């Protein structure tokens, strides 16, 4: 089961209330990489069925212009999640986000439901992927188990609000309260070979703070960030897209390593910096990211 979309570009995942047709009919205009159609927290208890119908209709009729269509279903401890998955698969979503994931078994339950519905609605096996949201101390502690749980899982995402509540603290804007979870999650994700995404930044008035937050998680190795407003998209894309300077240096590294390797030379310099074979994968990733972001102009 090898779905090429597991590694697709996901710098931004923008939350949208599935209950409001006006929000989910043309969000592709904002150019987020992924659109998170929300059936969970954004929808009142007595509106779950309405939101699910609205979601199904949007998935069937709206052209999202290449943006990934992710649906956050209701929790596995609610009576709604199974019908949510049925609507997602029948409607044609690309991925499903599991909220409040704490164990590998949570992922297995969703994967089994997806498989049943793919068969029912004639979709290829393994076409619908999974992302698990970690929202508690237990979920973060079990990050590696969750990351290695199922082939359908392409990544994990931090949900900072519920996580800090579980830690008996709160979101400060500094990121200090999230540091441990972020480190644990990115290490687990990289060990398992899946992607890792950061939590939302809710203070829309503090764009300087938002930029700093994005810069920090980029340096930590995250693949992208959940967002709640279109104004946040350009900042995330700017920071997560290689500059031409980065790309040119990466090209030099790849070409030099390829040529020096044939000569048996293991260490050399590029632009005055000492380089060895350990730099190769990072340089290739930079070039691959540039290609996926549409900014690559080279010949590799």
Features from the language model and the residues they span:
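Expand to "…catalyze enediolate/carbanion chemistry for C-C bond making/breaking, isomerization
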Residues: 1-300
């Amino acid at each position: 089961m090898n779905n090429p979309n597991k590694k697709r570009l996901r710098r931004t995942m923008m939350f949208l209330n599935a209950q409001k047709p006006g929000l989910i009919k043309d969000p592709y205009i904002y150019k987020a990489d992924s659109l998170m159609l929300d059936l969970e927290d954004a929808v009142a208890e007595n509106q779950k069925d309405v939101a699910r119908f609205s979601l199904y209709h949007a998935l069937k009729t709206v052209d999202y212009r290449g943006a990934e269509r992710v649906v956050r279903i209701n929790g596995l401890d609610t009576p709604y999640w199974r019908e949510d998955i049925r609507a997602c698969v029948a409607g044609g979503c690309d991925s499903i986000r599991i909220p409040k994931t704490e164990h590998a078994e949570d992922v297995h339950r969703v994967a089994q439901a997806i498989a049943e519905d793919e068969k029912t609605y004639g979709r290829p096996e393994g076409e619908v992927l999974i992302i698990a949201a970690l929202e508690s101390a237990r979920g973060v502690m079990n990050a590696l188990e969750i990351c290695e749980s199922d082939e359908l899982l392409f990544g994990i995402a931090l949900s900072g609000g519920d996580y800090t509540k579980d830690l008996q603290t709160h979101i400060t804007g500094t990121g200090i309260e999230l540091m441990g979870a972020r480190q644990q999650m990115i290490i687990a994700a990289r060990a398992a070979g899946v992607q890792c995404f950061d939590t939302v930044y809710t203070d829309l008035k503090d764009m300087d703070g938002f930029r700093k937050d994005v810069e920090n998680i980029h340096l930590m190795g995250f693949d992208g960030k959940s967002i709640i407003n279109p104004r946040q998209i350009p900042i995330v894309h700017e920071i997560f897209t290689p500059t031409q300077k980065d790309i040119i240096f990466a090209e030099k590294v790849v070409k030099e390593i390829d040529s020096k390797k044939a000569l048996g030379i293991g260490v050399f310099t590029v632009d005055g910096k000492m380089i060895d074979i350990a730099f190769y994968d990072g340089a290739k990733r930079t070039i691959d990211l540039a290609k996926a972001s549409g900014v690559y102009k080279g010949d590799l």
